[in-house]
Amino acid sequence: MSLKLGSKATVVVSSANVAREVLQKYDQMFSGRSVTGAAHTLDHHMVSMVWLPVSSQWRNLRKMCKENIFATQRLDTSQGLRQEKLQELRDYLHRSSVSRKAVNVGGAAFTTSLNLISRTLFSKDFADYDSDSSQELQEIVWGVMKNVGAFNLSDYFPVLRVIDPQGIMRDAKFYFQKLFDIFDDIINERLQVRGTSETKKNDLLEALLDHSIKNEFEFGRNDLKHLLLVSVNLITFNKLVGYKHTCLKPLSMYN
């Protein structure tokens, strides 16, 4: 079945046989996707593994993610880190129980996942249970994910892109830049440490910096930041989608 959604032609596959043809026989032809307006923010679509068409650049990025993020060995070695972060959450809940302090369940869960992600990527904690820093980072990360995935009239009627009636392009640029500023600070800090110490961190940033130095013309600092953005979004989505509404609508628990 073929549908016309605004200016976009859409094909709906409704049978198993046709789906098999599309996904197996003609997968290269159908592997591309329409790039949303928000994905054009800071030229993200030109260097992002999510939006690039199948090409040598896309294959190289996928290989880097496979080796440095989703490799079985790396996932196995992070088991101790997961246990550590869950223990920190348990200790926080225990302290709150003893002091009879209200607990924002969504906020505590987000802080746990955020620190697990940041330790995996950058070997440092981003947030603390007793501070408001996790709330700000939560808004930035969800701001990026929400605007990139939001229904945007401009994607179906390109003539509206100039006026941006829903403000999605404006908001996407704001949150993208906020996250990139954080990445810049982290990268600068790591480069300073690398310049004064021979000890290396065993995290994604270290691996990407090594690759960037060896392949400066193929994978520069801008590419590095965009790949970090994709990594944060992928891991965050997998970990947080189960309690998204809890995070957005805080639930307080009194002990």
Task: Give the positions of each predicted feature.
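Short clusters of hydrophobic/aromatic residues that line enzyme substrate/ligand-binding pockets
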Residues: 30, 49, 208
